[in-house]
Every structure is written in C-alpha cells, then in structure tokens.
Amino acid sequence: MDHPDPSRRRLTPGLELAALAARCPFPASGTAVTCAVSGGADSLALLALAITAGCVATAVHVDHGLRPGSDDEADVVAAAARQLGAGFRSVAVTVPVGPNLEARARQARYAVLPPDVLTGHTADDRAETVLLNMMRGTGLDGLAPLAPGPRRPLVGLRRSDTERVCDLLGFEPVQDPSNLDPVHRRNRVRNELLPLAADVAGRDVVPLLNRQADLLAEVADWLHEVAGAVDPTSARELAAIPVAVARVAIRDWLVQGGVGGGYVVDAAAVERVLDVARGSSVATEVVGGWRVARSRGRLGLQPPSGQR
C-alpha cells in the first residue's frame, strides 16, 4: 500500500524537504509562481516545496463560502505562508446554483486563479481521475489526465509524501469533511474502489495507473501531432485517414473552434460528426447548441443561435 520510504527518516528535515522538492519539476529557482492553496495537506506541501525549490511563491486561497469555518481555512493558509516567507491573498467566490457541486466549485475557483497557477495534484489524484474518466466513457486524452510538469509539480509524489511535508513543518492541514461524503463519486473511488483494486491485485495500483497514463499520453501526443496535419473540414480527407486520427482531428477542431463552454465534447459527439463527414447525415448537434453541417464535401461549424 501507500507507505513513505523508511530511508528518508534518516535525513534531517531540511534535507528531506530538499529531496522531495528535487523530485518535482518546479520552475527554475527565482521564478515567481502562484500556488493554489486550500489548506489541505497537498496544497500546503505544494507551497512548502515551491519555496524549498527556490521559487518566489504566493499562496492564493479561494473561499467558496460553501461551509462554515471557511475563514478559518484562509487563516491556516495565511499562517503557513508567513512561516515559509511566501506571499498570501484570499479571494471569495460565489458558486452558482446547479447540479454537480464539485464541478461548479472548480469552475468558479479557476475563474479567479491565473492561468499558470500551480496546483497540488498528486499521483493519487491522477489515479483517481483515470478511473473516474474511464467510468464516464472517456477517450484517449481522458485516460492520460493531469500530466506532470511545472504546473502540476507534485504528480510524481504520493499523498503520504505531502502529509510528511506537513509533519516536518508542523502544519495542521485543513480536514475537509466533504472528502468522506460518498455522494461524491471521487470519494468512492478514493475510499472504496482503489482499496478494493489494491486488495484484488495484491499490490498498490496507483503507480500502475500512473504508468499507464504516461504510456497513453505518449500515444495521445503522437495522434494529436498527426491529426494536426489534417484538414478536419474536408470530408474526403477525413475518409482517407485512419479513423483514430480522424476522431482526434475532429475533436481538436471542435474544441479549438470554441465548442464546449463548460460541456464535454464526448466520444458520441465526435462519432456524430464523423457520420456527417461520411454522408450518413447532413448535420448534427454537437453539444451546447453547437452544430456541424456538411455542404459540398466540407464541414462547417455553427455556433448556438444566441452567438450568431
């Protein structure tokens, strides 16, 4: 299961933090970065390791106002930032009413964060997301989510690592009670499905899921590169290439054209567009009121009526 490396306990706290930071692809020392910090162990560790890596970090806490005590969570982040010598600011947002609270809160949060914000996603988060996307019937990109890199520097670490960082620094992370609520599908994946998979496999499956995501990311990158040379509006060209490449070319065209607006361009939508390209139908609705129509062998993208 997920256990810290016993050998690291022989290191001093400073060396242990440095060793963990060295495993993370943070930007170069001296780079100014913004870290999204909720007050949980992962985001507090993100801030601490960014400072350890030499970044000039500012912690941004987003208060969604969804539960009592959110002001206290901001205080936890502010205190950690002071201890580390990082900047701090808190932003309050209003989460719109509607279904899928988790998605709406995420959308409200990212609307006020800079596009290059660093997040504290770990290998455990990535494994959960692979399984969640698989259950939604995702395509290849969804099976390779949360790619590691400077914006997600902790993807190579485990939750036990982020908890260890907090222990070393004396942080008491915020415990979000909603993380135990089985009404949220991610919680069931985290607390039920992954432990069951580990029991059946007789080993920790998080590294296996991450390894598969890495391999599929390489395939996805290649497909996107090949699809980039295709004219997705040409029905003849789409018919002449492997269907896997055609699917990627169509989806990239739709997304780059602005289709989505909070909706997912799923595999079924791509297949409907392929049917239009093949001549099985003249036009189809994609998602959110967007349509694709065929005329004289070419596909055209039509925005919702209110955007024309």
What is the predicted role of each segment?
Residues D2-D42, T58-H64, V93-V95, A108, ...:
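AMP-forming adenylation/ATP pyrophosphatase catalytic core
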